[in-house]
């Protein structure tokens, strides 16, 4: 839920002693910061990053910039908006298929397109940035080179001093057999 006042009421009414935030949207919108800034909630532990940390999940463009800045290996990329759409189409021409287009913002797991056709990739880029195929999430689109391999999520708990690595998880995103079809 992103209605933080309603969350506050529920936490107080039910005497909740710890909050574990699962969905990305409340984190990106600053639920952890809301707890820290509120006298009635600031002593309740919240598991989940503050708004600044959640931006790593909430913006693909920010994440890519962060990875490049800190020397973290990642695919070659560029970001585009409707203002530089033609440059985006030209960038697609420099890549080898398949083409990867990612809505910059949160799109409920649906904002990534992997396309084999250059013409289709150009059309989808235009649909994303000009017609907001994924709403505001696709006002900026990250185009990156395709990397073949297994995608894993690694989870780490930290208090800012120490950390604990949790088990990794593989998300089987595609609807069809053989990792084909749309994301689920």
Task: Kindly label every feature range from the protein language model.
Residues 73-76, 94-100, 115-153:
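Conserved ATP-binding module of the ATP-grasp superfamily
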Residues 17-59, 71-82:
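A short, GP-enriched loop/loop-strand-helix hinge that lies immediately N-terminal to
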